[in-house]
Amino acid sequence: MLNAHAPVDVAMIGFGAIGAAVYRAVEHDAALRVAHVIVPEHQCDAVRGALGERVDVVSSVDALACRPQFALECAGHGALVDHVVPLLKAGTDCAVASIGALSDLALLDALSNAADAGGATLTLLSGAIGGIDALAAARQGGLDEVRYIGRKPPLGWLGTPAEAICDLRAMAAEQTIFEGSARDAAQLYPRNANVAATVALAGVGLDATRVCLIADPAVTRNVHRIVARGAFGEMSIEMSGKPLPDNPKTSALTAFSAIRALRNRASHCVI
């Protein structure tokens, strides 16, 4: 059946592993048109070469040929200030994947104020974890406790404070490398903060959400677990996520979450 409506004009912020996967998934979707891609200046030529003249590839919001209807951020924390804030101020609805950055209250306020000023909507993607819809719904009746437990293979914690806690290259048994609030987890482990921050913002907040991070030689994937209780009852959900085929460090579900956000934007019936 032919699409009776004009496609939604989309700007993508970032064209790394997630951005490229999202673009490939919706490239031929009649309800969507990725007409703009915003990337750092040094990446523009390569992205133009990959996408051709049909996409407006620029390095700033000011350089866009026209204002998009919707923007999807999958570029990392810095892009929220540089690109999402001005887009929201201009009235463009945005969905963002870099939730971990929102542990910074000043940034969260800046995004909220920009959305208010532009009359736009900011959507936080669920990313690599499921159950966020249930958790956010349960919050309406009151939550007594929310915990997030994250497990990764030891080498997945290289380059983090975990290196000072244990020998990540020679572990025989699991070891807890962090216990505390979601806010502290985001500050100490910024590259691993998106899931914990998403759980916190959907539930009882960054300070009340308890986080446990574990280096576990028995797992080969990133394992996420949410435990919650409140007026709704109790909930426990665990996910063992696969990476994108062409990028072992990137959750496939994060890309699928972004694809869903785009298709929901173009749909008249949304779940």
From Swiss-Prot:
Where along this sequence does the record place binding of NAD(+)? A128, N194
GO BP annotations listed = NAD biosynthetic process
Q: Which reaction does it catalyse?
A: L-aspartate + NADP(+) + H2O = oxaloacetate + NH4(+) + NADPH + H(+); L-aspartate + NAD(+) + H2O = oxaloacetate + NH4(+) + NADH + H(+)
SUPFAM superfamilies documented for this protein: Glyceraldehyde-3-phosphate dehydrogenase-like, C-terminal domain, NAD(P)-binding Rossmann-fold domains
Known pathway: Cofactor biosynthesis; NAD(+) biosynthesis; iminoaspartate from L-aspartate (dehydrogenase route): step 1/1
Q: What EC number(s) does its UniProt record assign?
A: 1.4.1.21
Pfam families referenced in this protein's UniProt entry, alphabetically = Asp_DH_C (PF01958), NAD_binding_3 (PF03447)
Tell me the GO molecular function terms.
aspartate dehydrogenase activity; NAD binding; NADP binding; oxidoreductase activity, acting on the CH-NH2 group of donors, NAD or NADP as acceptor
| Annotated InterPro entries | Asp/hSer_DH_NAD-bd, Asp_DH, Asp_DH_prok, L-Asp_DH, NAD(P)-bd_dom_sf
Keyword Transferase, does the record have it? Answer: no
Catalytic EC class: oxidoreductase
What does UniProt list as catalytic?
H224
Is the keyword Oxidoreductase assigned to this protein? yes
Keywords for this entry?
A: NAD, NADP, Oxidoreductase, Pyridine nucleotide biosynthesis
The record's annotation in NCBIfam families points to:
PRK13303.1-1, PRK13303.1-2, PRK13303.1-3
HAMAP family for this protein: NadX
Name the family the entry cites: Belongs to the L-aspartate dehydrogenase family.
Task: Give the free-text miscellaneous remark of the entry.
Answer: The iminoaspartate product is unstable in aqueous solution and can decompose to oxaloacetate and ammonia.
Q: Tell me, what does this protein do in biology?
A: Specifically catalyzes the NAD or NADP-dependent dehydrogenation of L-aspartate to iminoaspartate.
Q: What is this protein called?
A: L-aspartate dehydrogenase
Encoded by which gene? Answer: nadX
